[in-house]
């Protein structure tokens, strides 16, 4: 890396990229975590989490082997970003539904739907040759669900070996009735207004703690991923500016094109750069698509795959480390990344073939 960029330029790029990530990514994630934490605190105080758990347990248990309350994490991350689920995980009224082996899988579950609304809205707005962008996005969302189930199930296979399947995250006294605890919740003293404000502030404070906890992981890991993903400046030279990198991952993708293209059905070899970029940042990945669509190298089938993989992966290499650290399960980070890599690949393959099947009837 230093030989290609020059030692001084490489160090300057490292520092500038880390600084830009702090300003543009970390504080953004912290803001999301604060808002999500505040909302989850409000939901917890007024029984929304308990209600969601009761309503969706019949669905979440067979699909994910998670309590129904986990569905609230899906909704939260779909509307915002991966770390939003951490604000929920800090709430005792949310954690009490989870056994110890289930909690680490929240990282995989939340990441599978991170930035879902943003990615979907962005892709629907594309002007594609042949149309069908809306159908492609629907297929992509459905395929992301498939990928999330695979990712979570693989992760639970590892966590069961680590924690067993009996112990709950929230410790209860021997004399306490488990059924009574699961069907009741703690509330604050005072009127509705006072309880709401207190819940919002306490939940937001949990979000600040989450935002601070993810700083080391985001800056170090995401900087490394960016160094391997992006290319040189516009004129092909290295100046030491942020995000000037050696573009190793796109180069690797082209070398593996003979394997990846049949699986994902890309219209053009350049399409592989989108899911590869999504490893580090979904926002950066979808930013590549409009130019490809204008050039005619991206069609509806590609959009289905991009939607599924950008949603399912949504920059997991840059957030998984921080999220697992925040949940205090660092030792399982490698297994979480492996599980999610497989889940994202399955989401992309599913999107390709499901879209082809759907188009037979349209």
Regions found by a protein language model. Give the residues of each.
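Membrane-embedded helical hairpins/re-entrant loop segments and their flanking transmembrane helices
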Residues: 39-72, 89-100, 256-260
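Membrane-interface helix termini and inter-helical loops of multi-pass transporters
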Residues: 8-20, 128-129, 234-235, 359-362
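Short helix-coil transition sites and intra-membrane helix breaks within transmembrane domains
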Residues: 28-30, 41-51, 64-67, 73-87, ...
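Intrinsically disordered, low-complexity non-transmembrane regions of multi-pass membrane transporters
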Residues: 158-205
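Transmembrane helical segments that form the transport core of multi-pass membrane transport proteins
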Residues: 7, 36, 40-56, 189-282
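N-terminal signal-anchor module of multipass membrane proteins
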Residues: 1-46, 51
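C-terminal transmembrane helix pair
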Residues: 84-153, 282-362
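Alpha-helical membrane-inserting segments
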Residues: 39, 43, 147-155, 159, ...
